[in-house]
Amino acid sequence: MSGSTAIGLTTEVISIITFILVIAIFVIEIVSCVTMMTLKAITLKKRLSFCQGCGKNASLVILPCKNKVCMECALKMRCPVCYEACLWCENPDGSLSSLALINKERNKVRDNLPEP
């Protein structure tokens, strides 16, 4: 015969409720862990992108020929993979940039720097 607790439930009922709660928490932890590992794998894949021109691990832009290169390789105005002339690139945020304009601005800043 089973004993009764102060709140009127038998110990079997309390043990069943505890078992169900433990199983539910375990399932929630597994789902949380799988979700976290999936997100980590996706972001790691994006972080480990290397330039197709020089091999540097840098912030990459996408050229019109769909090759991913660093900004230094893109500013040469020619794709280092397929050797197509490139006039613009797609930034990581999806916006488009004119490579000629970026080159012009960088040259202007470089020319205005005083000699040490």
Curated annotation (Swiss-Prot):
Residues crossing the lipid bilayer are: 13-33
Say where the protein is mainly found. Answer: host cell
Question: What topology does it adopt in the membrane?
Answer: Single-pass membrane protein
Q: Which GO terms describe its cellular component?
A: host cell membrane; membrane
- Subcellular localization(s) per the UniProt record: Host membrane
Q: Which UniProt keywords apply?
A: Host membrane, Membrane, Transmembrane, Transmembrane helix
What protein name is recorded for this chain? Answer: Putative membrane protein
Q: Which organism does this record belong to?
A: Alethinophid 1 reptarenavirus (isolate AlRrV1/Boa/USA/BC/2009) (Golden Gate virus)
